[in-house]
Amino acid sequence: MKNKPFWVQPLASLPLSLKPIAAIQQKHYGAVLNPTRWWGRMPRLFWLVALFVGYLERKNARLDPGLRALLMTRVSQQCECAFCIDANSLRLAQRSGAMDKVQAVAQWRDSALFSPAERVALAYAEAVTATPPVVTEAEKEALHRHFGDAQITEMTALIAFQNLSARFNAALDIPSQGLCSPKGKPHA
């Protein structure tokens, strides 16, 4: 973590109940992920949040893994969460196999890299992330042309989860960890 003074200090040492997840993060990323040091003040809630995202990211999820990463990246950008943009950009780069899509997310409306279904989902993610959420009838109809009710429900849960995560991290100024390098090569 950078030597920036935090207005809410991260934990220097994690509770015993979070040591297993810290070990997994250390092995996979080479470090304990920054948000863990803040969520660590509430280990039970941390595990509930981890279970929530774990369910949304399960192998038999209703949404394609690349679409999930795309939506999480866009919500992270809207919430201006440095850590989330970094982590979700890495996930999107890994799942799409290229950095060009990652670099085009913020300008998705002007990019040919996104499918019609991705465009509809991105518009929905932006509408749900707005405060208050404003989803138009046209957006609802467009969603139904590409996704079923179960997929839309799961998409909404994913967007809501990413809003929770990004707003928590952004409010506490949790920094990026350089997981997805700016030079076009993802780490890990």
Residues covered by each model-derived region:
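Hydrophobic alpha-helical segments
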Residues: 1-188
